[in-house]
Curated annotation (Swiss-Prot):
It comes from the Bacteria. GO terms for molecular function: glycosyltransferase activity. The chain crosses the membrane at residues 228-248, 263-283. It is a multi-pass membrane protein. Belongs to the glycosyltransferase 2 family. GtrB subfamily. This is Prophage bactoprenol glucosyl transferase homolog. Its EC number is 2.4.1.-. It comes from Escherichia coli (strain K12). Pfam families: Glycos_transf_2.
Length: 306
């Protein structure tokens, strides 16, 4: 039985040797043929030479190198495209997702699950701000989007070959892998685990990248941000109509002069702000549609060596 580990890497020269050694020395995986697909996402350090060297000595290491940094989501997709295992497991090279969890994922898969999610029962290794913003994102996404995604589940999971083949059929270029992996469906099971500390290096994700990923997740699987502006427009129009009617009656009945420029200026600025926000939301969707229509490849591989 062949298990493929899909491992995106970006400037991870310190972590890769530790990860590789940990996988190869883990006793419970020695009964399986474990393929390791490293995807070098345009690294500037020695990452590429390290994974190429591993591939020379180990035929089960598949090194993929992008021509530039395309991002983690395209890197994951590239790994799924090139993995040949009966089951495929995306995993981070920093070992925050422990190798010890993998046998439990395999066990659930062998029991009949098409996808086995690895759910973080403890995220204390993440900062408080990251935990809180992640919690808000999951709640917002699951309230307005379909399908829902399991809270506190990242990319670390096991997928059957059938699930991966279905994912590979998806043509979109704007990728939100957590949503895509949920969208394909199938019988799903869950294994809980405690996330560990990072073994080496620093995280390559920052607040801006996480914000863009959250936007991608919502715009890829929900039209609610577009639809809500219809209701906002109705509310604003109703308020404006009521206020206009009140001013007319106030002038006719009580003879009060119509109040001057301050209220007019505030109203114009308020409506202008509302319109600009609405245009911005619309622009997010139009921009993503524009990118999709170009049909550019999700990634470009510079080198594939065995």
């Amino acid at each position: 039985m062949k298990i493929s580990l899909v491992v995106p890497v970006f400037n991870e020269e310190e972590a890769i040797p530790i990860f590789y050694k940990t996988v190869r020395e883990f006793e419970e995986l020695k009964s399986y043929e474990v393929e390791i697909v490293f995807i070098n996402d345009g690294s500037k350090d020695a990452t590429e030479s390290i994974i190429n060297a591993l591939a020379v000595s180990d035929p089960l290491v598949v090194p993929l190198s992008f021509t530039r940094n395309f991002g983690k989501e395209p890197a994951l997709f590239a790994g799924l495209d090139h993995a040949t295992g009966d089951a495929i497991i995306p995993i981070d090279v920093d070992l925050q997702d422990p190798i010890e969890v993998i046998p439990h994922l395999i066990e659930k898969w062998q029991a009949g699950a098409d996808m086995v999610l690895a759910k973080r029962s403890d995220r204390s290794t993440d900062g408080r701000l990251k935990r809180k913003t992640a919690e808000w994102f999951y709640k917002l996404h699951n309230k307005i989007s379909n399908p829902k995604i399991e809270e506190n589940v990242g990319d670390f999971r096991l997928m059957s070959r059938d699930v991966v083949e279905n994912i590979k059929l998806m043509p979109e270029r704007n990728l939100f892998m957590k949503g895509i992996l949920s969208w394909v469906g199938g019988k799903t099971d869950i294994v809980e685990y405690v996330r560990a500390e990072r073994i080496a290096g620093d995280t390559k994700f920052n607040g801006w990248k996480l914000w863009n990923l959250a936007l991608e997740g919502i715009t890829s699987f929900s039209t609610f941000p577009l639809r809500i502006w219809t209701y906002i427009g109705l509310v604003v129009a109703s308020v404006a109509f009521i206020y206009g009617a009140w001013m007319i009656l106030d002038t006719i009945i009580f003879g009060n002069a119509v109040r001057g420029y301050p209220s007019l200026l505030v109203s114009i600025l308020f409506l202008g702000g509302i319109q600009m926000i609405g245009i911005g939301v619309l622009g997010e969707y139009i921009g993503r549609t524009y990118i999709e229509t170009k049909k550019r490849p999700k990634y470009i591989i510079k080198r594939v060596k065995k």
